[in-house]
Amino acid sequence: MADHSTVNGSEIPVYNLKCIDLANPDVHQSAAVLKQACMESGIFYVINHGLSEELMNEFFGQMKKFFALPMDEKKKLFWNQSLRGYRPPAQAVIDNKTQQKDFGEAYHIGVDVAKDDPNCGKFFYGPNIWPPADILPGWKETMMRYQEETINVGRAIGRIIALALDLNVDFFDQPEILGNKTASYSNMFHYGVPGTDFSKEIVGAPPHCDLNFITLLATDEIWGLQICREKNAQPQLWEAIPPVKGAFIVNVGDMLEMLSNGAFRSILHRVVFGKERYSTGLFLCPSHDYVIECLPTCKSEDNPPKYPTIKTGDYILSRFRQLAADTVKDNKAV
């Protein structure tokens, strides 16, 4: 923690993340740094990841072109039950105390799954929804290339995680985890749609932990991401994460916390913004059939498993059901 960040006149501490360099030939050193980061906070930077600056710029440029389309055009691509497509702003109340609606919009894509695939229609499985090529030429190709290359970065990080957990380096390369059966998906976010009042603090995403394995976040260098390292503490202490040009911000999700028996902590985070902001997250997620259970290197007689064994698909469904129940409960309390 080095200094403070000002968000609409409010100062909060800045938390300086540890950094993993994927070009570092000493992978065991990287594993040691990653292990410390995941045990202390559950979030870190990744640099020299192999994605070119040209691709990153092209991706963000195409994303901005989509969100700049007329609302009527965007709503033609409304998201479906597989969580593919466009999510307009004001879909939910994200702050029950103030009744603030969602001032962000999003677009969701994932690994393409054919309509006749048995998994099609489940969360994060299904054919993608694409804008017409005559409206956004090259959009689909850019998005798929970015997603594919980012998934490969995630696999490289997964190998370092494996070493940090005393597993074989290719443990997470299994088809059902991060291999060719992965249920990974990408979300593109635009915070601060027309009509947003930037004179006050705006919650773009309420406090939450990601449900997946790990998340790779890239931003347009506008501040907004905040973390709470002690997620069960009251009151919560929020710290700002500085955006770093060309770097991914990687955070631990609930599934990795469960696999590691709580050694690696999923991080509670939120987005608070004071100006227009674009970001994208690649959410690495095992297949629905993968069984989440404590890894053999993370348990012992003195440290038995802390979490119940559960299939990925069942866990995802339980999280969405809980989210829906909490929303109903909070709305009744207002």
Curated annotation (Swiss-Prot):
As annotated in Swiss-Prot or TrEMBL, what is the tissue specificity of this protein?
Expressed in maturing fruits and in juice vesicles.
Pathway recorded for this protein: Secondary metabolite biosynthesis; terpenoid biosynthesis
Question: What is the name of the protein in this document?
Answer: Kihadalactone A synthase LFS
Keyword Transferase applies: no
Query: Carries keyword Zinc?
Result: no
* Gene name in the database record: LFS
Q: Which UniProt keywords apply?
A: Dioxygenase, Iron, Metal-binding, Oxidoreductase
Give one Pfam family, short name only: 2OG-FeII_Oxy
UniProt: Fe cation binding residues: 208, 210, 269
Which intervals hold domain Fe2OG dioxygenase? Answer: 181-286
